[in-house]
């Protein structure tokens, strides 16, 4: 059900008192939670708050730098393995690139794709229109606000704003992208060039996904014909994320630890660091590589690979100095298609590890649970 678009005049007059209540800093849930869910963090940032509202304050054990390891506390970073698509297209070099891709999916669950063929004007245009969307007046953005996780176009806040015990410092715009011609007319009309720019980016992103996914199946030794056909007719959801400047970033997160549904997620980052991956028990910040896509293995690919490829936990930190924008594209099969471990990857030494699943099952789970800390994927495990 859509959330009310505009607060009434009485709510506007109460804003000062709500801000004061929000800045009590005790970490508890105060009476402003519904207000925050309706307005989002960009509005809070623009209102000039100087302390983090209690609804956004994480328990001490979950705060950045506290949950895992010295590297996180010290601000450790990681340069992810790099997959060069231009080399993948050269027959004499393809084998070496496939080995790099295979090792990255097994060890990190993350890698960066370069020389992907998507022009700088497409990538830069997408980041630019994303920033301009979040600069729109609040009433314009609120037209698309919904708490329905199944909505094809949805502006929202936090991670799962209906069920999050503590809200995340993040606003987002989700756009269903397939079939593109059927959904683009439901996308926002402001900024005026959003539909044109985002559709061009979505098409290019889908092409990169298909090329990388075909390579991943080849590296696994899995016959990819049927899978690739299902993915070509599958789903693509683009999430445009906005992480505004936060007055006390050490107390909260932009996104909690989670893994992604689907086969692969392709993330376009701006120059502001924030994405962290869990590796060897430590939270490590991914160094942004201009013009690249950060790609991570999703739950469906871990299932299809029978656990050989890893869908790993990741999260997003925020900062007090610069707004951060990213665009994540989630790719999978159609909701009714079943994902199973590939028969080629099951034998006496490698018994089947996962139950069959589908996207509809995931969406139902997300609507009924917090959906973080890989709990959905764990729910599909046989042992």
UniProtKB/Swiss-Prot annotation:
Keywords: Cytoplasm, Developmental protein, Dioxygenase, Iron, Metal-binding, Nucleus, Oxidoreductase. Its EC number is 1.14.11.-. GO terms for molecular function: 2-oxoglutarate-dependent dioxygenase activity; metal ion binding. Binds 1 Fe(2+) ion per subunit. It comes from the Eukaryota. The keyword Chloroplast does not apply. Residues 1-27 are annotated as: Disordered. Fe cation binds at residues 258, 260, 314. Residues 234-333 form the Fe2OG dioxygenase domain. 2-oxoglutarate binds at residues 243, 324, 326. It is an enzyme of class 1 (oxidoreductase). InterPro entries: DIOX_N, IPNS-like_FE2OG_OXY, IPNS-like_sf, Oxoglu/Fe-dep_dioxygenase_dom, Plant_2OG-oxidoreductases. The keyword Chaperone does not apply. GO terms for cellular component: cytoplasm; nucleus. Its cofactor is Fe(2+); L-ascorbate. Gene3D superfamilies: B-lactam Antibiotic, Isopenicillin N Synthase, Chain (2.60.120.330). Belongs to the iron/ascorbate-dependent oxidoreductase family. Interacts with OSH1. Involved in the regulation of shoot development and salicylic acid (SA) homeostasis. This is Probable 2-oxoglutarate-dependent dioxygenase SLC1. It comes from Oryza sativa subsp. japonica (Rice).
